[in-house]
A protein has these predicted regions:
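Extreme N-terminal starter segment of soluble prokaryotic enzymes
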Residues: 1-4
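Glycine-rich beta-strand-to-loop/alpha-helix junction loops that act as flexible
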Residues: 9, 91-93, 209, 323, ...
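Short glycine-rich, Thr/Ser-proximal phosphate-binding strand/loop in the N-terminal lobe
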Residues: 12-57, 229
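Short beta-strand-loop/turn "lid" adjacent to the catalytic site in phosphate-handling enzymes
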Residues: 71-123, 144, 150-159
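Glycine-rich phosphate-binding loop of actin/hexokinase-like ATP-binding domains
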Residues: 151-255
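Catalytic phosphate/nucleotide-handling subdomain of diverse soluble enzymes
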Residues: 218-219, 224-260, 266, 330-361
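Adenine-nucleotide phosphate-binding core of ATP-dependent small-molecule kinases
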Residues: 266, 273-277, 284-319
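Internal helix-turn-beta structural module
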Residues: 299, 303-324, 333-398
Length: 398
């Protein structure tokens, strides 16, 4: 069965068509600038055929029409017709407390996702637009919602509650939810396979280090704590997000800079993190280049980033009373040897030993610890699209 995986943003739509039996990516692409001038679809097949389609996309429905046209195109498509797509899997950012696993999309599911929009105003409305667009174009094809937050619904109360008046939780469901759950689950399960062990016997810490970054403690196969909170702003320093901060800083900046709360949160979400500290870029490649040139703020930034990751590893080792494996994944975790080296330099107390030769790897499965290391260190490339396809297949079946 071929499964179309959709990740819909407010002005973009990423897609992959995956053969759920072979798990091969048949085609993938991206629609950009939806609803604006200069909208474009970039499409690529497994055979290396490429297409760039510059067509007006006034809305996401038109974008989905163009995606289907690309997938079925005689020259650069990979299927003959819509009939060869068995199901659609949608990435949904926030499922709140309503969803602890993936769900078949029904009117009831859509209403529940809408009800979570207050918790993810930047993401859920866009995800819903993607669902409605696909329903309009692919009326009879079953669809599944896979939630970033679902994997973390196993966190105990002591891990997810904030020290705020309890009625705020009762009234507004203000608590820690966590994100990147699909990635953390995929990576932890694959790490257990790489180690040849049952995940139910392991304590694993997954470091998802990309432009967005989070750390998760996975004990016996379930998430017991994670670094992101009510929103993805909590936790690690990130590409443009500040991460953990004294909440009183918000009021302080508002007063000093004469900004509204919304404007200050925008700074913390979009102008902080690596971008804010370096003043150069949110892209780690640019930051590393600046480090090599001796840029002091870039050096401060990479050291701060690694330090924060190492602190969370220490916290989650305590939370689980030990750790068997530490995994590095996502853009930075998979591809930046020096970052892994910096983080590992803090792990001597765990008797975790990095093998410098094995660590010279990028974007592929690897055990990068020494044979004598008391804790396994791994590089495990994430594959959220494949994880979504697997969840979709589970619910839809053949």
């Amino acid at each position: 069965m071929n499964i179309l995986v959709i990740n819909c943003g407010s002005s973009s739509l990423k897609y992959q068509l995956i053969d759920s039996n072979s798990e091969e990516v048949l085609a993938k692409g991206l629609c950009e600038r939806i609803g604006a001038k200069g909208s474009v679809l970039t499409h690529k097949t497994a055979e290396g055929k490429k297409a760039v389609v510059e067509e007006p996309m006034p809305n996401h429905t038109e974008a989905v029409h163009l995606v289907i046209a690309a997938l079925t195109d005689a020259e650069y498509g990979c299927v003959r017709s819509l009939d060869e797509i068995g199901a659609v899997g949608h990435r949904i950012v926030h499922g709140g407390e309503k969803f602890s696993k993936a769900a078949i999309i029904t009117e009831e599911t859509i209403k529940a996702i809408e009800a979570c929009s207050d918790l993810a105003p930047l993401h859920n409305p866009a995800n819903l637009i993607g669902i409605e667009a696909c329903k309009e174009v692919m009326k009879d094809i079953p669809m599944v919602a896979v939630f970033d937050t679902a994997f973390h619904q196993t966190m105990p109360e002591k891990a997810y509650m904030y020290g705020l008046p309890y009625e705020y939780y009762e009234k507004y469901k203000i608590r820690r939810y966590g994100f990147h759950g699909t990635s953390h689950q995929f990576v932890s399960e694959h790490a257990a396979e790489m180690l040849g062990k049952d995940i139910k016997d392991l304590k694993i810490i997954v470091c998802h280090l990309g432009n967005g970054a989070s750390v998760t403690a996975v004990q016996n196969g379930v998430s017991v704590d994670t670094s992101m909170g009510l929103t993805p702003l909590e936790g690690l320093l990130m590409g443009t997000r500040c991460g953990d901060i004294d909440p009183a800083v918000v009021e302080f900046i508002c007063k000093k800079e004469h900004k509204t709360v919304e404007e200050t949160l925008n700074v913390m979400n979009k102008q902080s993190g690596m971008l804010g500290l370096t003043g150069i870029s949110s892209d780690a490649r640019d930051v590393e280049a600046a480090v090599l040139e001796g840029n002091e703020r870039a050096i401060l930034t990479v050291n701060t980033f690694a330090y924060r990751v190492a602190k969370y590893i220490g916290a989650y080792t305590a939370a689980m009373n030990g750790v068997d494996a530490i995994c590095f994944t996502a853009g930075l975790g998979e591809n930046h040897r020096l970052l892994r080296q910096r983080v590992a330099s803090y792990l001597g107390y765990l008797e975790a030993e990095l093998d410098d030769v094995r660590n010279d790897v990028a974007g592929e499965d690897a055990i990068i610890s020494t044979d004598t290391s008391k804790v396994a260190l791994l590089v495990v490339p994430t594959n959220e699209e494949l994880a979504i396809a697997r969840e979709t297949k589970k619910l839809v079946g053949e």
